[in-house]
Amino acid sequence: MMTAETTGRAACLIGWPAAHSRSPLIHHYWLRLHGITGGYSIEAIPPEGFAEFVMHLSTHGFAGANVTIPHKERALQLTEPDDRARAVGAANTLYYEGAVLRSTNTDVEGFISNLDVAAPSWDRTGDALVLGAGGASRAVVFGLVERGIGRIHLANRTVERARVLADQFGATVIPAAWNTLGDLLPRVGLLVNTTSLGMKGQPPLDIELALLPRDAVVADLVYVPLETPLLSAARARGLRTADGLGMLLHQAVRGFELWFGLRPAVTQELRALVEADLL
């Protein structure tokens, strides 16, 4: 386990099991780039040990942490969450304000920042259509509501799940049955896939992109493979796209700033570094 005494400020990723993550690669790149003495490690903590580990995070030498499966909901209960974490129902970033352990959800910022960079003015192109009603969808929908998108259609194969999620975000979020996509696509300026369809080992997302307006933006949260069938088809039609790797990189920015006191940039060099690790 890393300690602040030997490495300067430190942060970590808490998960179970401790799967391969690109987060250490990202944060160590920024630490080296800015000459900051510090570190970022992966801590494999089972659910039964999570509360104790988090409550003694600073004792372990950490200024904060990222939290991944299966701990995101429990992290919300053990910390003082901000409005984003509360609305999304999950926390993925922990940090201290004085002696108080606080939490936020940087997936929201990661998603929106990635769109701003990849497709400027994306928020002026009409309705949004979000595919899927799982945990990732909550962060996306909250970000779109926060940005002021007037109408957000939320489609899921089990429409009741979409309805339950939509009810939590107000009248601008409208649940939709999967078989109504053909009617929705012609008025959609932003299409977002939050499902696992198109991920390596999963079937591709079957959707008729020809129905989208020519100025529409297509975003996919999947980043393995980097070029999903959905994004490939969208680019072939001349549509602007935003990939899942961009969201991964941008969501890491806020945590680094909270822990190490400097807001880093998502550079092409960093992107190339992580892309190489994905291959």
From Swiss-Prot:
<keyword id="KW-0521">NADP</keyword>
<feature type="active site" description="Proton acceptor">
    <location>
        <position position="72"/>
    </location>
</feature>
<dbReference type="InterPro" id="IPR011342">
    <property type="entry name" value="Shikimate_DH"/>
</dbReference>
<comment type="function">
    <text>Involved in the biosynthesis of the chorismate, which leads to the biosynthesis of aromatic amino acids. Catalyzes the reversible NADPH linked reduction of 3-dehydroshikimate (DHSA) to yield shikimate (SA).</text>
</comment>
<dbReference type="Pfam" id="PF18317">
    <property type="entry name" value="SDH_C"/>
</dbReference>
<feature type="binding site">
    <location>
        <position position="244"/>
    </location>
    <ligand>
        <name>NADP(+)</name>
    </ligand>
</feature>
<dbReference type="InterPro" id="IPR041121">
    <property type="entry name" value="SDH_C"/>
</dbReference>
<comment type="similarity">
    <text>Belongs to the shikimate dehydrogenase family.</text>
</comment>
<feature type="binding site">
    <location>
        <position position="223"/>
    </location>
    <ligand>
        <name>shikimate</name>
    </ligand>
</feature>
<dbReference type="GO" id="GO:0008652">
    <property type="term" value="P:amino acid biosynthetic process"/>
</dbReference>
<feature type="binding site">
    <location>
        <begin position="132"/>
        <end position="136"/>
    </location>
    <ligand>
        <name>NADP(+)</name>
    </ligand>
</feature>
<comment type="pathway">
    <text>Metabolic intermediate biosynthesis; chorismate biosynthesis; chorismate from D-erythrose 4-phosphate and phosphoenolpyruvate: step 4/7.</text>
</comment>
<keyword id="KW-0057">Aromatic amino acid biosynthesis</keyword>
<dbReference type="Pfam" id="PF08501">
    <property type="entry name" value="Shikimate_dh_N"/>
</dbReference>
<feature type="binding site">
    <location>
        <position position="92"/>
    </location>
    <ligand>
        <name>shikimate</name>
    </ligand>
</feature>
<dbReference type="GO" id="GO:0019632">
    <property type="term" value="P:shikimate metabolic process"/>
</dbReference>
<dbReference type="InterPro" id="IPR013708">
    <property type="entry name" value="Shikimate_DH-bd_N"/>
</dbReference>
<dbReference type="InterPro" id="IPR022893">
    <property type="entry name" value="Shikimate_DH_fam"/>
</dbReference>
<feature type="binding site">
    <location>
        <begin position="21"/>
        <end position="23"/>
    </location>
    <ligand>
        <name>shikimate</name>
    </ligand>
</feature>
<protein>
    <recommendedName>
        <fullName>Shikimate dehydrogenase (NADP(+))</fullName>
        <ecNumber>1.1.1.25</ecNumber>
    </recommendedName>
</protein>
<dbReference type="GO" id="GO:0009423">
    <property type="term" value="P:chorismate biosynthetic process"/>
</dbReference>
<dbReference type="InterPro" id="IPR036291">
    <property type="entry name" value="NAD(P)-bd_dom_sf"/>
</dbReference>
<feature type="binding site">
    <location>
        <position position="221"/>
    </location>
    <ligand>
        <name>NADP(+)</name>
    </ligand>
</feature>
<keyword id="KW-0560">Oxidoreductase</keyword>
<dbReference type="InterPro" id="IPR006151">
    <property type="entry name" value="Shikm_DH/Glu-tRNA_Rdtase"/>
</dbReference>
<feature type="binding site">
    <location>
        <begin position="156"/>
        <end position="161"/>
    </location>
    <ligand>
        <name>NADP(+)</name>
    </ligand>
</feature>
<feature type="binding site">
    <location>
        <position position="68"/>
    </location>
    <ligand>
        <name>shikimate</name>
    </ligand>
</feature>
<dbReference type="GO" id="GO:0004764">
    <property type="term" value="F:shikimate 3-dehydrogenase (NADP+) activity"/>
</dbReference>
<dbReference type="GO" id="GO:0009073">
    <property type="term" value="P:aromatic amino acid family biosynthetic process"/>
</dbReference>
<feature type="binding site">
    <location>
        <position position="83"/>
    </location>
    <ligand>
        <name>NADP(+)</name>
    </ligand>
</feature>
<dbReference type="InterPro" id="IPR046346">
    <property type="entry name" value="Aminoacid_DH-like_N_sf"/>
</dbReference>
<feature type="binding site">
    <location>
        <position position="107"/>
    </location>
    <ligand>
        <name>shikimate</name>
    </ligand>
</feature>
<dbReference type="GO" id="GO:0050661">
    <property type="term" value="F:NADP binding"/>
</dbReference>
<comment type="subunit">
    <text>Homodimer.</text>
</comment>
<dbReference type="Pfam" id="PF01488">
    <property type="entry name" value="Shikimate_DH"/>
</dbReference>
<dbReference type="GO" id="GO:0005829">
    <property type="term" value="C:cytosol"/>
</dbReference>
<keyword id="KW-0028">Amino-acid biosynthesis</keyword>
